[in-house]
């Protein structure tokens, strides 16, 4: 300790000191033995948010569809809306029903309407607004229970565009892939990423008005995905099959679909591409 006192008084002594001794003296500096004070306790309800969730049970026909409020402590919850729904189901109301699977924006299962916008619950952050958040099913769809909607018509429309490779000739090399150039492969970008969550179609007023005749943004995006595929040999037949005043031309370029897509795709752009191809055919 005498050496340490000398160092504090004499800059010359500090300059002559070896690095090893200097490091030992620095390391020997006493530390406070008193523990750090604990953080102040949070106020009760300081981080509590209300969620108004659509409820309807077909097994209770006397109870009409309604919004039910749940208060959730966000200090003990993940950042996404799906975290809130899971917390409510696990801790408050096990009867709350919704679809979910991957929790990574890949499967499209947890599509719903959150504060007026369609989106995936697993990718939508909890609103920082102090007002209550409203969670409801995808709009203008038949509700099976709570936040679960009937996707039958949506999938039938997807199936109707025959979303698979169709060829008239045998592959150049039987049993092997059909090659594509990088440029041809790039034409599929912005279409193959669709996860069929139905956020786009159920945000479209034209789809609300004509859900059985109009194919909707998702199905038409997939139609164009195969129209643009250089390996497919049924381009004309695909264009002819959707050249209809309802199937295709019921799109009025409102572009709600582009705003709603949780994957950042642009269905309106690809519908416009199909319309231009119809004029050129």
Swiss-Prot record:
Per the similarity annotation, which family is this?
Belongs to the succinate dehydrogenase/fumarate reductase iron-sulfur protein family.
Identify the taxonomic lineage of the organism of origin. Eukaryota, Viridiplantae, Streptophyta, Embryophyta, Tracheophyta
Q: Where is the transit peptide?
A: 1-25
Catalytic activity entry: a quinone + succinate = fumarate + a quinol
Q: Where does [2Fe-2S] cluster bind?
A: 102, 107, 122
The name under which this protein is listed is Succinate dehydrogenase [ubiquinone] iron-sulfur subunit 1, mitochondrial
- Residue ranges constituting the 2Fe-2S ferredoxin-type domain according to the UniProt record: 49-141
Quote the SUPFAM superfamilies the UniProt record gives: 2Fe-2S ferredoxin-like, alpha-helical ferredoxin
User: Which cysteine pairs are covalently linked by disulfides here?
Assistant: none
